[in-house]
């Protein structure tokens, strides 16, 4: 009798555990946070331009206005070649201090291309509201618009070559020889070899695989392995490349 109850208890635990895993997987696959009830500011919202070409033209127009107001304004455009898009540039605008130079502000946007609309909006707001006569009397400003224009245009974080620009800038080539020893542990987990498919077995088992890996190696080392950036897996995430990106070479 005791053995029978033990078996029943064990089966009940297995069923409860299976249900818990099923619920966790379902919530993981269907998670969608509710949008907050915030009334957008129409004037501020107008600054956000989703498409790269439109944002670039808006930046150039603001540059025209500043060039008409201030002296010795310099402008440049660095073309960025692409096999998938055209008309890509890193645009620069330099407004020197108009009277007695004491400091220089450098502002860039779109290092992670998909963040470009927000960065462009903030840049143009800065141009409209902060680049006035008083501020520019002793302070110069250098603006760099869309460091990663391909990512901006294609709504991708990385460049066309999958390079994370935030981990690409280096004073010497030693950076590109950096060994991220922990990254191979997580590469197979976070970079599936098959096209994305929410119904695939590897997706359904992702949570269990992740929990097992955390239990084996610890959250800290795994987080460090991912966020540190890596230079050995060109198709992996946070890939820093093997040399300066062409637009950074031009800026250097």
Residue ranges, per PLM feature:
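Structured catalytic-domain cores with a bias toward divalent-metal coordination
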Residues: 2-252
């Amino acid at each position: 009798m005791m053995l029978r109850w033990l078996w029943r208890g064990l089966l009940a635990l297995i069923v409860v555990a299976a249900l818990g895993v099923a619920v966790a997987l379902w919530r993981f696959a269907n998670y969608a946070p509710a949008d907050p009830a915030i009334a957008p500011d129409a004037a501020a919202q107008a600054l956000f331009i989703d498409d790269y070409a439109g944002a670039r033209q808006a930046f150039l127009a603001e540059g025209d206005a500043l060039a008409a107001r201030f002296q010795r304004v310099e402008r440049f455009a660095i073309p960025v070649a692409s096999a998938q898009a055209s008309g890509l540039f890193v645009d620069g605008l330099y407004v020197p201090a108009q009277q007695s130079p004491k400091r220089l502000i450098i502002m860039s946007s779109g290092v992670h291309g998909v963040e470009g609309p927000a960065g462009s909006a903030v840049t143009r707001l800065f141009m409209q509201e902060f680049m006035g006569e008083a501020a520019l009397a002793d302070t110069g400003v250098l603006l760099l618009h869309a460091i990663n224009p391909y990512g901006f245009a294609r709504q991708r974080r990385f460049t066309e070559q999958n390079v994370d620009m935030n981990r690409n800038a280096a004073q010497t080539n030693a950076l590109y020889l950096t060994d991220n020893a922990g990254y191979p542990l997580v590469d197979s987990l976070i970079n599936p070899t098959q096209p994305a498919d929410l119904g695939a077995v590897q997706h359904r088992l992702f949570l269990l695989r992740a929990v097992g890996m955390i239990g084996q190696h610890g959250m800290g080392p795994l987080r460090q392995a991912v966020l540190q950036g890596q230079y050995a897996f060109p198709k992996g995430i946070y890939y820093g490349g093997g040399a300066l990106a062409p637009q950074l070479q031009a800026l250097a």
